């Protein structure tokens, strides 16, 4: 989609004309997010977001309309902007349902979908002051021309138009997580709610998002591959720099230079007993010689996330106690992955992993009773994965897996320092997590390139040439023997 040069400038006043285009080339309109014209290195013609074409977005909307009862509306708001302080926002992340259905990566809009009207988008109206502070954003023109909305209005028209749509609908589905007062405060919405006509949309959208299309799988594979490369580089680096904060910074750097827009979540980098805190996030401690470090990380690539965990000894050698416990988690990881196939459920995988882990922990004398198992592992063996890290959370774990589902397999054990067990096991936390695509015949491990065998990890850590200057400048990693930079802006390594 090419925008004309006439759109390049925006009148600030009668006498003053200021161009605020972040990507001004005199021929390309800035709509506040990449387009094939503004970012040809990222996007091919016909794509609305990198890797996903307009036909796919239209197909998703058609499927959602088919799932809606007759004469129903679906209202999906973009995610709210969260402020760090005063006028300074946190990095914006779009609501996954809104992104899935519209392709719009920006805040301030509300999308409404119905059989009668198709996609109707209410878009933000920027003032010159907004543009001066935040740059150009997608408005009504972009809604029609880029996102291919059937109808597009400025957001100020929402109360009048949406009220009328709600009044004429028998049911209103909406995205509760990102619900906006722009519509929940409308009298007609509140009347519908009081009559029991307002329903949750996520049960429908999460259903659609469970099965990934070929284009989505390409992005999921790429996201997983970036996570594997980033974690491997960080693992190698850990021998010279056993520090949670440095490793957290490095894994983010390694993912972002490979094209990821952000991490899928704040990485968990727990050294020693910090690894027994499941979602440890402080990442502020040195890792003691001989301790393990657990790193749970993932990145987001054009809306699709990865989720990967490895646990290793930065010193390069597992102790015999660490090896014994690690082997139990590794065997459980591998056995559960082997069970992944159409028809199996996450619940069944969880039951299987609980049996394996309980048996092992009892045999090692760590558990005195199977009843205590949940004190050492309160987590599920896995979850669905996609646009969100705990994706399609409205779908339960009793759903038979189908080709195109992506799930995680993440057995772990988290032994608090105070747990009543032989002292040598106290304060150890181990998790090994992979991303698994369900195929017609079984599975494909998307994170299979990241080593997890003890001998492979030890070999890698002990045959790696370190560059000490990397402590102050991660870029100098490219000077490490055997690594080469290339100048492709999407892929630096
Ligand atoms: N890796 C984060 C989680 O699964 O909760
Ligand atoms: Mn996970």
UniProtKB/Swiss-Prot annotation:
Residues 1-19 form a transit peptide. GO terms for molecular function: aminopeptidase activity; manganese ion binding; metalloaminopeptidase activity; peptidase activity. Binds 2 manganese ions per subunit. Pfam families: AMP_N, Peptidase_M24. Its cofactor is Mn(2+). Mn(2+) 1 binds at residues 307, 383, 410, 433. Its EC number is 3.4.11.-. Transmembrane segments: none annotated. GO terms for cellular component: mitochondrion; nucleus. Mn(2+) 2 binds at residues 296, 307, 433. GO terms for biological process: protein stabilization; proteolysis. Disruption phenotype: No visible phenotype. Altered mitochondrial protein stability. The keyword Manganese applies. SMART domains: AMP_N. Keywords: Aminopeptidase, Hydrolase, Manganese, Metal-binding, Metalloprotease, Mitochondrion, Nucleus, Protease, Transit peptide. The keyword Transit peptide applies. It is an enzyme of class 3 (hydrolase). Belongs to the peptidase M24B family. Aminopeptidase which cleaves preprotein intermediates that carry destabilizing N-ter amino acid residues after the mitochondrial processing peptidase (MPP) cleavage site and is thus critical for stabilization of the mitochondrial proteome. This is Intermediate cleaving peptidase 55, mitochondrial. It comes from Arabidopsis thaliana (Mouse-ear cress). The lineage of its organism: Eukaryota, Viridiplantae, Streptophyta, Embryophyta, Tracheophyta.
